[in-house]
Amino acid sequence: RDRVAAEAERGRRERAEQIDKRLQLAGHTGLMRYLEQLPCQAISRNHIAQFLINGGIARSKDHAFKSYLGDKGKYTAAAQWCEIPVAVATIQAAGGIAILAHPNRYSLNKVKLRRLISEFAECGGQGVEVSYSNLDPDKMAHMGTLCIENDLWASTGSDFHTPKNQWMDVGRFRHLPAHCAQKAIW
């Protein structure tokens, strides 16, 4: 577990360093210094978004993600995650239940999404987050069907990060589609 956590932290730091290089090329300096002063271990794009706001580069977190840190953002850098079997084994070794979080946010087409969920199930994954903030009901239904096809639990989540975020409040989410609600986990 410690090795996986250390690798995840290293990957987050490398991603921040890549974003920092892009910012420097645009004349914006100080990101790494800012991040090193924060009282956290897991650097995230939320921290970088706050740096962009503080520096007058972005107007809001929404603007920071849409224009600079999202998939097509000006300063974006790819995330580096561990392999699915490693993630599943680590979660289960710690006594957790391995749930694939918000899969419709990974910018995958239906074929790749189906493949991801199938691979996750084959690696011992136990569930998929089907209902989460602002997900289209048709996509929720599709996610529920993929859970059933792969014998996975259907999970829900609000994707709550902080009261300042506007997309959803803690504990608020849409109900699971009826066809997958019999095999649900919270």
Predicted regions and their residues:
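Charged catalytic cores and adjacent phosphate/nucleic-acid-binding surfaces used
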Residues: 1, 5-8, 59, 82, ...
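Flexible, glycine/proline-enriched loop segments at strand-loop-helix junctions
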Residues: 2-11, 36-38, 74-75
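Residues that form generic nucleotide/phosphate-binding pockets
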Residues: 7, 19-22, 26, 51, ...
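Conserved phosphoryl-transfer catalytic core
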Residues: 10-37
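Generic structural signal for short, solvent-exposed loop/turn connectors between secondary structure elements
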Residues: 27-31, 37-42, 165-166, 183-186
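Conserved acidic, metal-coordinating active-site core of Asp-based
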Residues: 38-103
